[in-house]
A protein has these predicted regions:
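Patatin-like phospholipase
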Residues: 1-234
């Protein structure tokens, strides 16, 4: 099981004045060790079957969200695919302040540019497809007929508010405000997806951490907490 030491190292006081509080170097090493040619070939094979593995990030400089097709990258970018996907995975986990932004090289109409990308949660906690996408029309075009549509939304967090005493200091109040914002954004994202797809006959199922799950992590990647959470979900 992955713990804190497998994901980051603390930068100590110097991190306050730098890009982030933590260095995700261990996570980069772990991702690169897992993204073997064999795994990338398996991901690429799913692209040929019409399946998509999507990752969302945000360009922190332009404030524009990007959705990356990892399956296509695995299938069509040759020797650079491991590096590109590693960077995108790190960027998708780069919570500003905690982890540094990741520099991603992209092809623009006016040439190649380096962009700074961070966690896509800044734009949306959950995403599915561009607004207004007509799924039935899409399926008729690619499969010859509309099919039964089921969408499963999984949220690694609680959706309901939690009654909790908050210490009256800047850090505690800021953390509480961010937690409240994330929950509100998650509910709005899920409601928006559900309402937009209901008109097309799509059945939407949702799952989140139960309200009665009372355990609290001692750190960002508390192994004992993650095991208990897994048992609850399983």
């Amino acid at each position: 099981t992955i713990g804190d030491a497998d994901v980051y190292t603390s930068l100590g006081p110097i991190g306050v004045l730098g890009q982030s509080l933590y260095d995700p170097g261990p996570l980069r090493t772990r991702i690169q060790s897992e993204l073997t040619d064999g795994m990338l070939d398996e991901i690429a094979a799913q692209y040929a079957r019409g399946r998509r593995l999507l990752i969302q990030t945000v360009d922190i400089e332009t404030q524009i969200p990007y959705i990356w097709d990892v399956t296509q990258i695995a299938a069509k970018t040759g020797q650079k695919r491991q590096q590109i996907i590693t960077d995108l995975l790190l960027a998708s986990a780069a919570i500003p302040g905690l982890f540094p932004p990741v520099r991603v090289r992209v092809q623009r109409p006016d040439g190649i540019a380096d962009e700074l990308h961070v966690d896509g949660g800044l734009s949306a906690q959950i995403f599915f497809a561009p607004p207004g996408l007509d799924l039935a029309k899409f399926e008729i075009e690619y499969f010859g007929r509309p099919r039964e549509q089921n969408l499963y939304l999984l949220r690694n967090g609680k959706l309901a508010g939690e009654d909790e005493a908050v210490q009256l200091n800047t850090l505690a109040l800021t953390n509480r405000a961010i937690s409240t914002l994330i929950k509100s954004q998650s509910r709005q994202n899920m409601d928006q997806i559900r309402s937009s797809l209901a008109e097309q006959g799509t059945q939407v199922y949702t799952a989140a951490i139960p309200d009665n799950f009372s355990s609290k992590p001692e750190s960002m990647f508390d192994t004992a907490y993650m095991r208990e959470l897994y048992r609850t979900g399983y």
